[in-house]
Amino acid sequence: MSKENLNIDRINELARKKKEHGLTNEEAKEQTKLRRQYLEEFRKGFKQQIENTKVIDPEGNDVTPEKLKKIQEEKHNK
């Protein structure tokens, strides 16, 4: 199992425990930390995916937003 899956499993485990019994201070801090890490990784992956996307209309024209084209160009020139 990947580290990400283990983190999701632990986040879910802590969420269930919070609903059923509540969390200790340490568990609440762990939950916050794991959620923050998960969101950070999710956002990073999503940003990479968007930055590598090209939008083509039904006629085959590149209609990628200019802002995205500029970001892609800057990354390509590095």
UniProtKB/Swiss-Prot annotation:
Keywords assigned by UniProt, alphabetized: Cytoplasm
Q: What is its main location?
A: cytoplasm
Database matches in Pfam families? DUF896 (PF05979)
What are the record's GO terms for cellular component? Answer: cytoplasm
**Lineage of origin:** Bacteria, Bacillati, Bacillota, Bacilli, Bacillales
According to UniProt, the name of this protein is: UPF0291 protein SERP0911
The record's listing under SUPFAM superfamilies reads: YnzC-like
Subcellular localization(s) per the UniProt record: Cytoplasm
| Regions of compositional bias (Basic and acidic residues) in chain numbering | 64-78
Q: Which family does it belong to?
A: Belongs to the UPF0291 family.
InterPro entries in the record, alphabetically?
DUF896
Q: Where is this region: Disordered?
A: 53-78
